[in-house]
Structures are given as C-alpha cells and as structure tokens.
Amino acid sequence: MAFLGVPYGRPYRGLGPELPSATAPAALRAASLAFQPYYWNVDVDFGGDLFAGREVLLADAGDVRLVPGDHTGNLERITTVVRTLLRAGTVPIVLGGDHAVTVPVLQAYAEQTGLCIVQIDAHLDWRDEVDGIREGFSSPMRRASELSSVHAMVQIGLRGAGSGREEEFAAARTWGSVLVPARTVHREGIEWVLDRLPQASAYYVTLDADGIDPGIMPGVNAPAPGGLTYWQVFDLLCGIAHRGQIVGFDLTELAPARDPSGVTVAHAVRILLVLIGALAHAGQFG
C-alpha cells in the first residue's frame, strides 16, 4: 500500500487562485505522527491488532510534482504516477486535493476490468462541465462513468440542495448509478447499503470529506449537515473489504485551514487507519 499526495486545488472562476484542500496531504502526514506510537497497541475498534497479525507494508510515495497553471499536464502527471504504482503491485491511497484528482487517478486503471466505484460524498458530482472545465471537482463521477474499466457505481451520502441539478440526477440514474441519500443511510443502516452494492471484480472507494457530517469533520470545502458518522464509514469500509478486493482509495476535499482545532484532520487520519485495518482483517494483505 502506497500513500500518494496530490496537493491540487484548482477552483472554477470566482473561487480564488487555489482551494484550501491543496494543503491537505501535508496536514495529513503531520497529523499521522500523533498516531504512530500507538499502531501496535490493541485497537479496540477492531477487537485487537489493527493489522490482524499480518505483515502490512506501507510506503509514502511523496507528492505528485505539479506545475501551477498547467491543468491538463497536471492531470497527466497524476495518471502517470498512479499507473506506475499499480504496475508495481501496490494499492494506491491518494491524498487530495480537491475531488478533481479522482478523474486522473481512475484513468490509471485502464487495464482493470469490472471496476465498481463507491463514492462517499454529499454531492453527486455529475456535472458535464463548469466554466468549460470537464475534469473539475464537480465532474469526477460523470468522467468515471465514461471509462471502459468502470461497470458500476454507488454514490452514498447525498444530501442538501447543492448536490446536483435534475439533469445530472437523470444522467446518473440512466447510466445505472445506485444513489443512496444520507437520510436513507441513517434510516436503513449500513447493512442495507452493503446489500445494494453491485458484485464486482474490484472496488475503488472515493471519499469526499464532506460526505461525513460537519459536526465530526468541519474542515472541508463544502460542509453539508446530515452526513455520515465515523461508525457508518467504519462499517462501510469493512463491509466493502469483505465483499471484494479494494484496489484503490482517495480522500479529497479536506480544508485544514478551516478547522484550526485539527479535529477534522485527526478524524481523516483515523479513517485512513480504518481502511488499512479493514483490508488487513479481510485478508487482503499477506
């Protein structure tokens, strides 16, 4: 498993020169140091060893070198680095950056077949374009649906009035995406959601931090009330890992500067550890 930083926050017109999510990879690395002394303690959430007694190799692949203002070139650089990690036989864990980074990451999976995308997000992200930009943070699921490697999609945690227009929801449903509003998650539970997860040869999980309730993680680009809880995300990641192979993961839209307390980043680091634990306990290591 290799952690890859993509400190990219290219906004649309009128949103300033750069989104605060560009600083997230560095903030996540710094916050992870606080957890380091405790990795080998009993992890109560997993009922014992986080790594399930397995040899788990973790590497930090650094950050993708990005060139300010070179949007197209930066996307290509991201794809190239992720493809290199995949061909080395590792599972990329991508630390964004805004949600636009998911597009070039998924393009690196061109050799994968039967991929199911599991998105945790307050927003639908099916815009075809915004300000003439087709690979921005409002469009990753639309672009994912166009990839030959992707055959299914589940979008979990949708809520609020800003998630998408009727035309985007219609396009997502027509394509076949399974849409699960946050209120449905709270009412029916995670097992209900997992029962609706399509069978797939592999799963890719993309977690937009605003998919989690802002009472837990307030430091995000677009907070929306009513999001998922830590335990729901915990059970979801563990459930996916037991249903099939997780071949990649990204965490996007963190805005560390909007939460000086550091609680948001601390929660995010814990979720990354949960992902590792979920994979280990599902037997996807060693």
Residue ranges and their predicted role:
Residues 1-286:
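Conserved alpha-helical scaffold segments that buttress catalytic/binding sites
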